[in-house]
Amino acid sequence: MNTNILQTLITAMQRRLAALPQRLRPFTTEFDELPKNLMLTGARGCGKSTFLLHHSQGRRLLYFSADNPKIIGEPLYDLVSSVFMLGYEGVIIDEIHYASNWSIHLKALYDDYPGKIIWISDSSSLVLRDGKADLSRRYVAIQMPLMSFREFLYLETGQIYPKYKLGDTILPTQPDAELLNHFLNYRSYGTRPFYQEKDFEARYMAIIDKILNNDIPFFLPSIYRKQPTCDASHYRHTGKLLNTSCTSHLLMLRLGNRSGKTLSTTLCDGKCRSIRK
């Protein structure tokens, strides 16, 4: 590997480690030890990179994202092998789907470097699901959910609440007013840990833009091959559809039997009501 590229990756990882928040969502800290070979999935912005970087501390691991322009075009096997040759214990690879033939390369790396740590992550469980056929016996899969209300309360108050199962728990009929206020805030913006940042609204928009501009075209390449000039129109129309879905108040659900006859219609426009036929 080019020395300049390696130094760039090391410096970028050091910046990320220095920027880790002091208070992490409990999902991150409740794992005592991660498996040697790990596939981590979860929605964009839920804290996957923070999770892996937190667990990398105290170990000689190198983090990089497969969409880093410095390494695009580099075969994944060759790149990771070079890192191992330099004495690293392992690698953390984010956005793995950007690496060409990633599942084949990871299988070979697992077989050729049995003592090394390889952690990968991606925002698309669809991508990792496709690779699980080759890797299911080699890599442990962990799904990182969006933040729970319990985790949100910890970030807000510093207090750890026990985990409850709704069916096993008697909930108070008159919850504390402050707790209700926290829940309203959680429902509005608290499912991703970066809500505490000053520019969290811009971060949300950046996630939406990346999904529209990168993720959807990646999963629908045939559309872009047939219509190479559709990029702008795709973004415009998909954005309009998303805006309509977010702001529309009317939702109609039709339930029918096997004969196709509509049995009931449910209208949701602030109030949900059923109309039986």
Which positions does each model-derived feature cover?
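Short glycine-rich substrate-engagement loop in P-loop NTPases that contacts/grips substrate
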Residues: 60-90
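Conserved lysine of the Walker
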Residues: 48-49
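Short regulatory helix/loop adjacent to the ATP-binding pocket of P-loop NTPases
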Residues: 126-141, 155-157
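Interdomain hinge/linker elements that couple catalytic modules in large macromolecular machines
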Residues: 2-12, 154-277
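N-terminal pre-Walker A segment at the start of P-loop NTPase domains
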Residues: 1-30
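Hydrophobic anchor at the beta1->P-loop junction of P-loop NTPases
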Residues: 40
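Structural recognition of the conserved hydrophobic beta-strand(s) that form the central parallel beta-sheet
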Residues: 92, 117-123, 143
